[in-house]
Amino acid sequence: MRIACVAETPDYLPAIAQAHLQAFGTLLPEWNFDEALSELRSHTRDGVIPTTWVALDQTQWLGSVSLLENDDARIRQWSPWLASLYVQPQARGQGVGEALVAHCVQAAACLGVPLLYLYCQPALVPFYQQLGWQTHTEFLLGPMQVVVMCIAPGAVTQ
């Protein structure tokens, strides 16, 4: 498995956009495929915010993760964000998610980010805790109960 900037994998962009829309669309009901695809296409460089990375094997994309300045207009008080972690169903349980999270945290550390945030459903908290993330707060985001978590990227990479 290798992890590449999404700009290096243009053939996969429509499939990734569709997967993101299916996985995260309930939180953003006005979001559509064209917006998801446009957002991914705007992530043209590695080592900057925003960017998206894709985990790949020899024949397919396995998952993706983004590093964003702002993730959702309702939670702009925290920034930046690890966002849109998605692993294809057939690749789950194989360390793809962990590798993508570690890659994003490392990139944030290289950019000097003091605290990196994510939000997730409560059932996913143990997954992130085992990777060093801590609970920051909990609240309702639209119809969904979410947990905001944070990590100090520089502390993880030292």
Where are these regions (language model features)?
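Conserved GNAT acetyl-CoA-binding A-motif
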Residues: 108-120
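Conserved active-site tyrosine of GNAT-family acetyltransferases
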Residues: 128
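Conserved acetyl-CoA pyrophosphate-binding loop and the N-cap/start of the following alpha-helix
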Residues: 91, 95-103
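C-terminal "cap" of GNAT-fold acetyltransferases
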Residues: 119-122, 131-134, 138-158
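Active-site rim helix/loop that mediates acceptor-substrate recognition in acyltransferases
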Residues: 21, 25-54, 62
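Conserved beta-strand in the GNAT
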Residues: 52-54, 60-70, 81, 86
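A short beta-loop-alpha structural element at the N-terminal edge
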Residues: 1-16
